């Protein structure tokens, strides 16, 4: 019975795709079937979604729309995507539909999008069937790289803004990503059902910041469905179809990839020209390697195999690639022996934050190595290098896009591979410009410094350089003084200050990346009671007075605790490290001096007092010289012990300093 229902409800819908010409002649009948499919039970809808789509190549380009949803974090982007998929009949209407496109456990737990996802929809409008390709995007600043890749496959975007929170820092960044890509931008105010919502005020913000007219702004609620039914028609009317030609040779852009343990690398392609058929051989414009298409199709929202992908379409391919290193994001693919001009690629992901990852037990090193290798197959933006610490043993030094990226990577290690690690305090890549030439380098050549051990002496360099970012902070104007003081304390340089409405301020500062990777965001939220938002983008390097700070225990340097600091912050940083060590190192039989030094000069010191044995306890009277003699002998013994004694620094002490 279930099989009969499936055939009755669904079969005509896929015949529409296979025989587009016959569909035009039978518009009324197909419309009735579509309407019935949307009103049917969840079982029928599930069956519909499971049916393979086999003839997408016949779909005309003018009936295709590729769009993305961009927004600040927690503005309802994933919930809106769920509602659109429900309206199009891709998934059944159910209260269980929450973050359908967020596949990772960490995404569902944190309520954020980390990995860009794609879903195709079939939607009937004015008697015509359209293929809508939705590409969901992350909202956090660390994953801007994912956003820029997704936008390369689109012709338009939905710019979603919370109707109560208004324009935030990431809203500004995402708008300009879409604007620079010359995409059609449809502004959408979400969460209008909330009591605190003020759509008119937020619409005026959009006009003031982005020059978007209030009447162009759509007002919806993804939670209760208000206004959602008008979004898909608006997308069809306002977003242009892709510009492409199916008669030209194949030209396809690879804009994302992930790893499957059974099938190898699965790549997401945007077909710019020509068409791609299962069994054909393609060639990479980057590596010149050739691959055979083993499988291809669209995401609906799960993988649905097809025979062909045509011009303007977005879909997945399986081509026997063994590593995501073969699937270079931004690469152009063409048919073998039919070369084409490569499409403009992407800037490679640049690590902004470095941290050491070490196993809790040295015996688990190989387990950690295997877990990191498997995880980086799905996240090619992470750079990995071997590392070794005198205190923590062998490990790895990893480069991340930001602090949230680092946290998410660590959480995925624990959840997906059951590996617990020690993460050292994050640092940033400095540079040193060498004073003299040598066999291995030119005069004034720049060297990237990612670890303190690489830090050159001041006599060898002309200047040190530190990475800086252009930060955008949006907050209520009553916190203006606190925000200015915070940015000044972080050695920031003010660029611009403007009001986005009567009460909210947008502040732009050039800030050292080293100053914001630890606790800047926490301080920002604390000083503004959570009302501020922060976004940053790379702004190159600038000259800085840097120094290598060493930690000495009774005059002996501890290499594992050496770090690079700005000279202005050397005394404060040294004091903090010395205090942490004083609390973590157990008392010895002799006094222990903890010193922080820069170029041999002590900038901070703490002393751990010796454990004192009462050697005069057995003296119950008599001459005082007897007590003095015992005390003198004890003092001499401690002096000898201090000269030959070796301080054992426990692992907990290193963790107190190195761990974030």
From Swiss-Prot:
It is an enzyme of class 3 (hydrolase). It catalyses: GTP + H2O = GDP + phosphate + H(+). The keyword GTP-binding applies. GTP binds at residues 71-78, 136-140, 190-193. Pfam families: EFG_C, GTP_EFTU, LepA_C. One of its GO terms (molecular function) is mitochondrial ribosome binding. GO terms for cellular component: mitochondrial inner membrane; mitochondrial matrix; mitochondrion. NCBIfam families: lepA (TIGR01393), small_GTP (TIGR00231). This is Translation factor GUF1 homolog, mitochondrial. It comes from Trichoplax adhaerens (Trichoplax reptans).
